Structures are given as structure tokens and as C-alpha cells.
Amino acid sequence: MSKGNYISFCGKRAFNILDETLKQEILTKLHKNYYITIKDKNFYILNSKNIKYIEKNPHILSVKSIGSLYYLFLTIIDGRKYSLFIDKKIKEGHKFPRIISVIYRFDDSVFNDTVFDGELLRDEDDNWLYIINNLLLYQGELYKNKNIVQKLGKVYQIL
């Protein structure tokens, strides 16, 4: 990997990518190839108008908590497999979101461009969890327009 430093991330050692050129390449790959940006919203705020619709039609709901929203992007860069947590917000004064490389073991095929959308949470015992809310991309195939049952079924297969 390029310019960066090792940090403690979710209680483990991880690599914080600082190279803005590499960050731009990663974000451009997601945007140009798959139309995925960190500004994409995957949720609706529950209110009195849409609650009636939800009551009348079957739905699967997930609740947004106080965790931090991240994509988990599994990809190959320069022939090496990477698991990249991409923060879905950009801190003030920065041009790019934080991108953290972690070591996760998945089947090799999943590293052919897979993107999970989820939330990092710490429980009351100080354990970190990544709650997957959605599957946006699987092995280079867009899952944005598939129904949630298909997406979650694929997530269970992957895990």
C-alpha cells in the first residue's frame, strides 16, 4: 500500500490510507464503474406519511443506531486483496473520507469488487461490530436494484 500509517481501529491494528491519489482512485473506481458514492442514501426517515404505507405493505426494516456509517469494499489493488472501510462522511477540512485497510478473510472471489453498506458499532462489552445493512455490489455485479431478500440471502452466503 502507499502513504499512510498504522492505527488502532475497532480495537485492532489497521492501516489508515493517507495517500490522496489512492483515495481518489478508489472512490473513482466505485463511482465510474458502479455508480456508488459515499453520498448515496440507503434509508428513509420514518414519519407519519410513510408509516401508513409500511403498515399496509410487507417490508423488511433495519434501524439506524448511533454507529458510524461505512462501506466495506473488498477489492484487488496491484494484485493484492484489500478490505477497505470507507467512511461515508468527510471530516471538515478534508477532501476525502477516511479509508482504512483491515485484514479480513473472505473467499478470494469476493475480492473481485464487493461492497457492503453498514454501520460500525461498539457494544457494552467494548466489542466492535460491523452491521451489514445492504449489499450494493457483489463480484462486480450491481446489487443496488435487487430486492432486499436477494441481497441479504447473498450476504448470508458470503459470510
Q: Which residues does each PLM region occupy?
A:
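Active-site-proximal "nucleotidyltransferase
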Residues: 1-120
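Catalytic nucleotidyltransferase
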Residues: 2-11, 105-159
